[in-house]
């Protein structure tokens, strides 16, 4: 696990040098796809009783890498899991829940799903689920939905003042949203 984890940490550092939409991004995504494909096939999406501790720890890293690499099989599997758990997303495995929800917003985005997830964030009391939802919601690329999300910054019923920093930071990290976030200030 340690070697694999360091490998993916190093590969993830390369994202800092890539701009969205550039040719280099496609090369990096292809690298992630190749790097994760066999491991994802071996590990699968859900754990079982025979999993070693290393397999349990590696699964979320491998799934995130496969999704970043635009592995079409992984994208469809994440979508299928989202659809299966749609009415009870909190029951998705906590270690992969954020990646599954983020995948849905990145590849199957609709305003309806966005608003459902934002409302789920508003009503849930599970802090780890809130973190997963925030991470996914701040990764959206649609300008209108980004502006709607920023409009919620001042609505304490949705985003509590103590949580605002995490939302702002998430949008700053999103190349499609960081200018909107700066403009809000």
Please identify what each model-predicted range represents:
Residues 1-185:
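Long, ordered, helix-rich scaffold segments
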